[in-house]
Amino acid sequence: MALDIIRYRLHNQLLSQTKYTQPGQVVEQLGAVQSQDYAGAKWALAQRVKDVTTDAAIDKDFNEGKILRTHVMRPTWHFVAPADIRWLLMLTAPRVQAGNAFMYRKLELDKAIIRKSYTVLEKALQGNKQLTRSELGSAFKKAGIAAEGQRLGYFMMSAELDGVICSGARQGRQFTYALLEERVPRVKPLKRDEALAELVRRYFTARGPATLQDFTWWSGLTMADAKKGIELIKSQFVSKMLDDQSYWFADSTSPVHEKSPTAHLLPNYDEYFIGFKDRSAIGKLVSPLHPEENSVALNAHIIIMDGQIVGGWRRTLSKHAVILERKLLTELTRSEERALAREADRYSEFLQLPVEWM
């Protein structure tokens, strides 16, 4: 079953096959894509479209609002589709806000000051303005609200979670914020059970075979929600038992047999890795007997060979090239080295820069 899990997940995660031509379609299929590492998250999307797209092309989609980046789960930034942002926030934001309560108290952010901060944001951003965090910090200061460091960050996160603001276009390397009401046209709202069923459906379609524990880890929702959600959509899914755990996946899935060996240079927060509480299925070469060695190899991005983690990689960008450094957990065969070289060529095409290995 472990090998089946790998084959199904590579297929469902759009790594061994894909029908999508646009990065935004990938975001919608996956439901949400972790993106605090913006550069890595763009590469995660690029690997899941039919034809090689470029870093600049995804920047363009992001700046045009075809892909949004906001706090929605766990809590960290995720890429989400504009049509999904409101029902996702309705479903997941209350849990994140509850988890943030300690920091709100520590930073003296009570309901009154948070409401006042929303008024400041609405006034500063109305008229389709898009401002950086530092510019909005200045707006808070003018309004007599202390907002520096963590305090500013939690003001902004709360406003994202409550659907006041979302991502705007980047200004150079800086992110901006926009009013959600102006950035994203309203669509017919979903009821909570409809939203729950939709999130569960997308999770197990795009990440199955997976367990309910995997879903609760990824979504931040409760086990009660997970069980209710699977009941709502289970006619479209099947489950198989492994080690006394039920693994759910779409009934219609027919995974392809990927050419072996096949390599993937995945970013550190790729959904193939971070989308599961239990990552043991892809970590057969990660030995618990050598934690220091594992840490050195895996403290950046991860190298996948035929679905298994075989090492880690880092990148250093210059104007004329991208320098890649790798740390392996196992020696690669010649055919695996060639597979890795092909993947590096894809990365080169994505960045529009030559790749050099250290």
Can you say where each PLM-predicted feature lies in the sequence?
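Short amphipathic alpha-helical interaction segments
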Residues: V52-K60, A146-S158, M223-I230
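A short, conserved structural fragment
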Residues: N63-V72, T76, E160-R170, K234-L242, ...
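Short, cationic-aromatic polyanion-contact patches
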Residues: F79-I85, Q171-L190, Y247-H257
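Active-site-proximal binding-pocket segments
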Residues: L196-D251
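Non-catalytic regulatory appendages
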Residues: Q236-P288
